[in-house]
Amino acid sequence: MSVKWEKQEGNEGVLTVEVDAETFNKALDDAFKKVVKQVSIPGFRKGKVPRGLFEQRFGVESLYQDALDILLPVEYPKAIDEAGIDPVDRPEIDVEKIEKGESLIFTAKVTVKPEVKLGDYKGLNVEKDDATVTDEDVQEELKGMQNRQAELVVKEEGAIENGDTVVLDFEGFVDGEAFEGGKAENYSLEVGSGSFIPGFEEQLVGLEAGAEKDVEVTFPEEYHAEDLAGKPAVFKVKIHEIKAKELPALDDEFAKDVDEEVETLAELTEKTKKRLEEAKENEAEGKLREELVEKASENAEVDIPQAMVDTELDRMMKEFEQRLQMQGMNLELYFQFSGQDEDALKEQMKEDAAKRVKSNLTLEAIAAAENLQVSDEEVEEELSKMAEAYNMPIENIKQAIGSTEAMKEDLKVRKAIDFLVENR
């Protein structure tokens, strides 16, 4: 094989590859063995047609595409390795010369990973946020636990207050006409939760059980149902029942109820403080790392190929769809509620996708500049962590991952971020 790489404008170039005649003829032989299984000619059993008769009847050219399908997935990766290039997209292949008994010549138009011109990345002036947890923070968290353990008790008398849960009937009208989805009976609503259209819940405060009221609101301009967005509406409301939260006492019994690992409120308080400290520290560390990467990336210069942005966009779309699925939704429903389509969502994500690509390229360049390496032992340690996290044997993790090259690159990027933190 001979390989020639010609760099062109931007991040594109043309790879010219010549595959020797022996290798090409072997691919033709393999193509014939595959194709002949489906060929029937009178006088011969299916799959037993002689090669010479096959070529006489159908022409050797009929084998070329199958031979290319066999050859290119093997020879193209060899060619890019020999040329020392790093493609970021599928190549555009053109066959320049193809003939039985001769060498095969093909070209591949390739977009390659761009060069990064690093700016300042050491001594970046980024301060880590204070991760101190105050007694007020702990008390606020305990109050939240207390609130979540509260029981709803029917108010025998008295009016609706913020935080109460009401059972009500409602029916909405726009321009005097009822609209789809605007009616419910015996609906439970926590007043002040912000679950309904702005202005609706506030107008329930002060009403008593049995009260009826016309609640006037205006749908937000960005409301998911376009036929209602920005329009005034009237909801006829009837209050059936009002329930108030009855908070449990903050004592040792409460502590044991919310956490079986503690015996006293003091233990729960201490455990809560440690948990908040860990969460705040992780948040501060995460923000620090994010800001350092952002600054280093802003200081770097790189011409990002559109192909890399498109690949990142596809990855972000998949991540977004997975998050929706975890919430019991899919893309189709999301588009229906948001009034967006896939193109609009991708357009919205495009800037972030480009930033992600630039940040990653910058970190890879920093890792190369500082000669940051990842050992086999570090990869093995990461695999062990994954096996523990997924509660699977490490061999199963290795089998699922296959090659660990991508993991090595991820760990190298992580080391580059560690370097930024240590040298800020």
Swiss-Prot record:
Q: What is its EC number?
A: 5.2.1.8
List, alphabetically, the GO terms of the cellular component aspect: cytoplasm
Residue ranges occupied by any PPIase FKBP-type domain in the UniProt entry = 163-248
What SUPFAM superfamilies does the entry give?
FKBP-like, Triger factor/SurA peptide-binding domain-like, Trigger factor ribosome-binding domain
Q: Which reaction does it catalyse?
A: [protein]-peptidylproline (omega=180) = [protein]-peptidylproline (omega=0)
Q: Where in the cell is it found?
A: Cytoplasm
- So where does this one cross the membrane? none
The processes (GO biological process) annotated in the record are: 'de novo' cotranslational protein folding; cell division; chaperone-mediated protein folding; protein transport; protein unfolding
**Its Gene Ontology molecular function terms?**
peptidyl-prolyl cis-trans isomerase activity; protein folding chaperone; ribosome binding
Q: Which UniProt keywords apply?
A: Cell cycle, Cell division, Chaperone, Cytoplasm, Isomerase, Rotamase
Recorded domain comment:
Consists of 3 domains; the N-terminus binds the ribosome, the middle domain has PPIase activity, while the C-terminus has intrinsic chaperone activity on its own.
Task: Check the record and name the PANTHER family matching this protein.
Answer: TRIGGER FACTOR CHAPERONE AND PEPTIDYL-PROLYL CIS/TRANS ISOMERASE, TRIGGER FACTOR-LIKE PROTEIN TIG, CHLOROPLASTIC
| Record function comment | Involved in protein export. Acts as a chaperone by maintaining the newly synthesized protein in an open conformation. Functions as a peptidyl-prolyl cis-trans isomerase.
Give the family, as the similarity comment puts it.
Answer: Belongs to the FKBP-type PPIase family. Tig subfamily.
Q: What is this protein called?
A: Trigger factor
